[in-house]
A protein has these predicted regions:
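Short, charged, low-complexity patches
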Residues: 158-162, 307, 347, 351
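An anionic, glycine-rich sequence signature occurring as long contiguous blocks
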Residues: 204-319
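Structural motif
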Residues: 1-8, 121-122, 285-287, 337-349
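Catalytic-loop motifs flanking and including active-site residues across diverse enzymes
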Residues: 7-10, 291, 319, 323, ...
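Generic structural signal for hydrophobic core residues of well-folded globular domains
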Residues: 15-19, 71, 299, 314-317, ...
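Conserved, well-structured functional cores that handle cations and Mg-NTP chemistry
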Residues: 1-206
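Short coil/turn segments at secondary-structure boundaries
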Residues: 27-28, 324-330
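A short, flexible helix-boundary coil/loop motif
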Residues: 230-257, 329-412
Length: 412
């Protein structure tokens, strides 16, 4: 066999890192000797093991898809999870903790619409449920992926997201048995079964709380806030240089349940109303209404500062939405059908998540030091520089000779 299995996997992974969002783009430069040598060095196959007289090439997409059709998703998933576990163990993700709990956002995403196979009435739409560690700096590192069983209707998809969540949290718990986790999600997950799971595992939760999801509990929380006039205060947000800025009002209440029965799950609700200050052309300041929302949580809320922190972390659920947007429109190819085979498709999706994780760490830890004096360069420009470097220069240094101090000093 010309290529090792590691080389085949690295060909796909490097394609995602270099934002090649289709298989044709991955294959367009496969005859480049510098790129081929880089892939061989990354995979550990080594150029010296290449057959004499054979031209250096990168594996084509059909070759690595042929390998991934036989499976490999558990091994790739383990690599994704181990990367995040390593960062947590080395205390590089302390910024992703709220009161000691690592904050994990959960949300479903449409992976792709697969090509309609022969004999099928319609094309299969594939969904995934993502668990991503989020942080105030915009970080959203994929930690675990659970497959959502396909349904044709949107309501069926939502039902399956909850079923996938129950499967996913068990596996996250198995991967991180002693890690305190705070689950952040949208209003779909603000229900008694999810809260009961968090209680059984000793986890915390901050979930978007909307009237349409639980009208009775929403009305109970709103009435309780109107009665408890003392449980309100100023909404405090972090401005530039982490300065505290008064930005609206916040209120909270406790003892809210989805059912009138005593055995129902009791939780706290925090509501906020943000006021945005804008400067007019004449220099005067005006206040405009900003974000308004409510969050269900099992954190103890005692004052307006704690309530403001709950609101801030609840709103950071948008980190995972932003990461999906980057994967869709930033060159990764999310929602693009790479392969009709579901095993290969799942493996490629996990490699995409691993590539995005690697890029986020690189962007947060390495680029700020390299980009001094080039602060206006976007990520797309840096990807283009990397792409040209791989094609023109490649990887020349021996990995064993790289100084470890650069890795130790990385801090998210």
């Amino acid at each position: 066999m010309l290529y090792d299995r590691e080389t085949l996997v690295w060909a796909a992974l490097l394609g995602y890192i270099l934002r090649r969002d289709t298989r044709n783009k991955m294959d367009c430069a496969r005859n480049d000797p510098a790129l081929a040598e880089s892939v061989l060095r990354l995979s550990g196959q080594g150029v010296e093991d290449w057959p004499d007289g054979e031209r250096l090439t990168v594996p084509c997409s059909e070759t690595f898809c042929g390998l991934l059709k036989h499976g490999g998703a558990p091994q790739i998933q383990r690599a994704v999870t181990d990367m995040v576990a390593h960062l947590i163990r080395k205390k590089r993700l302390e910024c992703a903790r709220f009161r000691g709990y690592v904050v994990v956002a959960v949300d479903g995403v449409e992976q792709e619409v697969a090509r309609r196979t022969k004999g099928a009435k319609e094309a299969e739409t594939r969904y995934m449920l993502e668990f991503k560690v989020i942080a105030p700096n915009g970080l959203a590192l994929s930690t675990f992926t659970e497959r959502v069983m396909p349904h044709a209707t949107e309501s069926g998809k939502r039902d399956c997201e909850l079923a996938a969540l129950k499967r996913g949290v068990r596996r996250v718990r198995k991967a991180f048995p002693r890690l305190p986790i705070c689950l952040v999600g949208d209003a779909l997950y603000a229900c008694a079964p999810v809260m009961r799971i968090c209680r059984d595992y000793g986890w915390k939760f901050i979930l978007t709380f909307k009237e349409g999801r639980s009208p009775d509990a929403y009305e109970l929380a709103r009435d309780s806030m109107e009665v408890s006039k003392g449980q309100c205060g100023t909404l405090v947000v972090r401005g530039q240089n982490q300065r505290k800025v008064d930005s609206g009002v916040v209120a909270w209440t406790g003892g809210v349940r989805f059912t009138t029965q005593e055995e129902g799950e009791a939780f706290n609700v925090v509501a906020c109303e943000e006021h945005v200050k804008r400067k007019a052309d004449d220099g005067s300041e005006t206040e405009e209404p900003g974000y308004r929302g409510m969050f269900a949580t099992n954190f103890d809320v005692s004052d307006h500062e704690v309530a403001s922190e709950v609101v801030a972390w609840g709103r950071r659920r948008w980190n995972i939405e932003s990461s999906f947007n980057v994967e869709k429109h930033g060159g990764y190819g999310l929602e693009h059908s790479f392969c009709s085979d579901w095993r290969c498709s799942r493996c490629l999706y996990l490699l995409m998540q691993l590539a995005h994780n690697l890029w986020q760490v690189y962007n947060a830890c390495v680029l700020p030091k390299v980009a001094e004096g080039c602060r206006k360069m976007g990520q797309a420009e840096w990807v283009e520089i990397l792409r040209r470097h791989f094609h023109m220069v490649g990887i020349r240094a021996d990995f064993a000779t790289l100084p470890r101090r650069y890795i130790r000093r990385m801090d998210l």
